[in-house]
From Swiss-Prot:
PANTHER family: INCREASED RECOMBINATION CENTERS PROTEIN 6 (PTHR28043:SF1)
Biological source species: Zygosaccharomyces rouxii (strain ATCC 2623 / CBS 732 / NBRC 1130 / NCYC 568 / NRRL Y-229)
Keyword match Repeat: no
The name this protein goes by in its record: Increased recombination centers protein 6
GO biological process terms, semicolon-separated: vesicle-mediated transport
Domain of life: Eukaryota
Protein family (similarity comment): Belongs to the IRC6 family.
Free-text function comment from the UniProt entry: Involved in gross chromosomal rearrangements (GCRs) and telomere healing.
Keywords (A to Z) from UniProt: Chromosomal rearrangement
Gene3D superfamilies assigned to the protein according to its UniProt record, in alphabetical order: 3.40.50.11960
Signal peptide start-end: none
MF annotations from Gene Ontology: protein-macromolecule adaptor activity
Amino acid sequence: MIMDSVSSPEQPKNKILVTFGDGDSIHQRELISQLFGIDIGIGDRIVKGLVWKTKYYRVEFDLYIDDYNDFSSWFQEFASEEFAALREAMAGLVVVDQYEPTKPLNPLGLQDTFVVWVNTDSKVGQDQVDEINDKLFQTEESTVELVNLHSNEDTNEYGEKIGIPRFKEIVDTCSWKNCDMDYLTSTSSTTNPEVSLELIVQRMQHARLKHANSEMDNDEALQIAQEIAEELTGKED
């Protein structure tokens, strides 16, 4: 497990840890390029001063790269007290491997940290991924999401982003707690634009789950849309 020095409890949560089930460094470089749009050197384990940029903001982050032979052993080490300081400094944890239901997806109670499992098994279809995520979303404490690396489409049947576009959307809406963010677009609203996007995504997911087992007519769909609009504008009945 890689380590690096960390500072005080008020330190920025600007570290993203990516761990691979495949130890092939060339393959790791290719996937890092797909996920983050950057090129790293062979053998790089800690890359500092990277920039994540959206149309709303830019922020610097550090990328940590690791791999494992046995995920359970790696996860046990990651969950130990020895790596508590690293966990507190993390903006995100990304596992890149074939998804297996027996592997733990417990986010360890990480606060203000996204946890993504990037499934590399092409035999796992998007319908199965959506089903797994539906179950995860029903657990309020869960911050884990499964993303399919080999998705042939950019969106699912609900119009939600999937695959690599969904991964990038998750990073876009990261809270980046205590980070020095450079906002690129002025707005008359006191709500940050990326926070609004996160609220939209979460509200739509919750609405879909709420009505997953029932047929929605036009009136019900309109009501959901109105609720989302009122929530984002702060309008009350």
